[in-house]
């Protein structure tokens, strides 16, 4: 609780909440940044309640000024004042307009501020919803000297009931509730020297929890010490404090009654949070598996694309040079050994066993392989016969399936006759 009692103060007192002071300072700083150094003062209305000679200032809002140039006489919009006051009355019926505040660069009430205070008083008294007050309160905050001294440069003035042109200083007392102290403490911790805080979110949360537990422990120790002093006769009993302590003890019994239910609920929540924490990991693992599968599929598609039969043939020699070089690790050679032979395939794929040559089978004499270059050579010499043989081979391959091996094309009789004639001519 802070007290400011200037000389000449009377019996009137003002109970001032921290929210009003914070809003006054924020209003001046924000306007100064937005409009530049030309702004010297800012004005706003104070909301609160009055109980006899005691006035309590709880909240405030900004007034809409008619001009921005402080060199000329300024005034505020009465329509905006009454509209905002009616809106607050709908939400908080106990709050009414009790005065005017000004945040500037001086301490005293200036001649240009007195007409504003008189205008606000007349507007409030003529309105049915804005509220009725005996004397208008005026708060003046010197934002220039704020922070240079330990004393808050805030001054309170009250208009005389008989003469509204006269104002006298009154004392003000800083009061706050438990929720307001927690909020102010939180804002003070977040506000650093350069607007930066190197602490992590987890560390801040842990510190807040530790501070709350420490405060609870201190309050419990204080209550226990007070009860011991009362029991010993050192202190006189205060029935209000004893009543609050009794209510707290009754709440402890309620907590013990629902301890088992609380434990079950806590365990269920813990399991749920554990499952939720595992879901991102499972999603990551599934993504990695999908990437591996995509790579394997791409490799398989690459191997099938290199197949001479476009992946439709499953015979052991229907694989080109690239597949053979990738499988055996041999350099690529564009010669007649472009295909796997039986010996290479059996030694590499099946391990050492008895070698079975194609000639051992009954069809070995007619099912022999000829390299592509030899087939092309015979095709050029035989003319139409080679083309006919290729058409027959393609038809037979479709009928017999992928295990069909084309027969070796044989030279025609015309080719033998031509060779005999050439030998006789020579």
Curated annotation (Swiss-Prot):
Top-level taxon in the UniProt lineage: Eukaryota
Single Gene Ontology MF annotation: metallopeptidase activity
GO annotation, cellular component aspect: COP9 signalosome; cytoplasm; nucleus
Key words, A-Z: Cytoplasm, Developmental protein, Differentiation, Nucleus, Oogenesis, Signalosome
A single GO BP: cell cycle switching
Pfam short name (any one): JAB
Main location: cytoplasm
Localization in the cell: Cytoplasm; Nucleus
Limits of the MPN domain: 14-155
The keyword Mitochondrion is annotated on this UniProt entry: no
Acidic residues biased stretches: 334-347
Region: Disordered, residue numbers: 320-426
Primary role: Component of the COP9 signalosome complex (CSN), a complex involved in various cellular and developmental processes. The CSN complex is an essential regulator of the ubiquitin (Ubl) conjugation pathway by mediating the deneddylation of the cullin subunits of the SCF-type E3 ligase complexes, leading to decrease the Ubl ligase activity of SCF. The CSN complex plays an essential role in embryogenesis and oogenesis and is required to regulate microtubule stability in the early embryo. Mediates mei-3/katanin targeting for degradation at the meiosis to mitosis transition via deneddylation of cul-3.
Oligomer status and interactors: Component of the CSN complex, probably composed of csn-1, csn-2, csn-3, csn-4, csn-5, csn-6 and csn-7. Within the complex it probably interacts directly with csn-2 and csn-4. Interacts with rbx-1.
Additional remarks: Although strongly related to metalloprotease proteins, it lacks the JAMM motif that probably constitutes the catalytic center. Its function as protease is therefore unsure.
Family: Belongs to the peptidase M67A family. CSN6 subfamily.
Name under which the protein is recorded: COP9 signalosome complex subunit 6
Source organism: Caenorhabditis elegans
Gene encoding the protein: csn-6
């Amino acid at each position: 609780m802070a007290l400011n009692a200037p000389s000449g103060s009377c019996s009137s007192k003002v109970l001032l909440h921290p929210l009003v002071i914070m809003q006054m300072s924020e209003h001046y700083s924000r306007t100064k940044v937005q409009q530049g150094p030309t702004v010297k003062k800012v004005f706003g209305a104070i909301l609160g309640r009055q109980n006899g000679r005691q006035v309590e200032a709880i909240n405030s809002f900004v007034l809409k000024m008619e001009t921005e140039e402080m060199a000329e006489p300024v005034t505020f919009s009465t329509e905006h004042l009454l509209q905002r006051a009616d809106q607050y009355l709908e939400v908080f019926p106990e709050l009414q307009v009790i005065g005017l505040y000004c945040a500037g660069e001086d301490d005293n009430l200036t001649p240009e501020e007195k007409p504003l205070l008189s205008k606000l008083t007349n507007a409030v008294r003529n309105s049915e919803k804005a509220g009725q007050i005996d004397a208008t309160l005026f708060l003046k905050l010197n934002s220039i000297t704020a922070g240079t001294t330990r004393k808050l440069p805030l001054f309170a003035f009250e208009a005389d009931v008989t003469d509204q042109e006269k104002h006298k200083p009154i004392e003000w007392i800083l009061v706050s509730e438990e929720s307001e102290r927690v909020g102010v403490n939180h804002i003070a911790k977040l506000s650093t020297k350069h607007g930066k805080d190197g602490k992590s979110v987890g560390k801040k949360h842990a510190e807040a929890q530790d501070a709350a537990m420490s405060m609870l422990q201190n309050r419990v120790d204080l209550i226990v010490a007070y009860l011991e002093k009362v029991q010993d006769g050192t202190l006189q009993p205060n029935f209000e404090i004893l009543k609050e302590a009794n209510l707290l003890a009754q709440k402890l019994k309620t907590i013990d009654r629902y301890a088992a239910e609380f434990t079950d609920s806590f365990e269920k929540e813990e399991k749920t949070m554990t499952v939720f924490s595992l879901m991102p990991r499972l999603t990551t693992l599934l993504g990695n598996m999908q990437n591996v599968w995509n790579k394997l599929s791409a490799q398989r598609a690459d191997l099938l694309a290199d197949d001479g039969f476009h992946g439709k043939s499953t015979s052991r020699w229907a694989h080109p040079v690239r597949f053979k070089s990738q499988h055996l690790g041999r350099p690529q050679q564009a010669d007649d050994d472009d295909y796997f032979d039986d010996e290479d395939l059996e030694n590499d794929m099946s391990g050492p066993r008895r070698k079975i040559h194609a000639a051992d089978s009954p069809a070995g004499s007619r099912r022999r392989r000829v390299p592509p270059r030899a087939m092309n050579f015979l095709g050029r010499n035989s003319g139409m016969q080679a083309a006919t043989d290729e058409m027959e081979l393609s038809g037979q391959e479709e009928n017999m399936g992928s295990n069909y091996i084309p027969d070796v094309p044989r030279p025609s009789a015309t080719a033998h006759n031509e060779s005999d004639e050439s030998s006789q001519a020579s």
